[in-house]
Amino acid sequence: MTEKLEDRCKRLIVQHEYKECEKKLGEAMLQNPHSEIPHNLMGILMEKENNHVQAMKHFRVAYALDPTYIPARYNMEQYGIMYPSGRYAYTEEDCPVQNKEENCS
């Protein structure tokens, strides 16, 4: 079974293997240039590396590629404020449960 990109990236980030994660995301962007997923994940990686400007660029690209992609919108909302919560949305399941439509869409 092949590991989903989101799961692989989350695992690599948790293990602080940022260079490997960046390499995998770069490959994914080349293979799927119109996919929002690698850009959202690259935004998370950039935030973890304290590169907020690049993170926001990738979140915006992910959102531009697919405005219905909830994790990108959630991450833009979380990290576009002065004091972010520190939570990331790798997938829709990572968005708050209480009211996904209000908080994540």
What is each of the regions a protein language model found here?
Residues 2, 36-37, 70-71:
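Helix-start (N-cap) detector for alpha-helical repeat units in TPR-like alpha-solenoids
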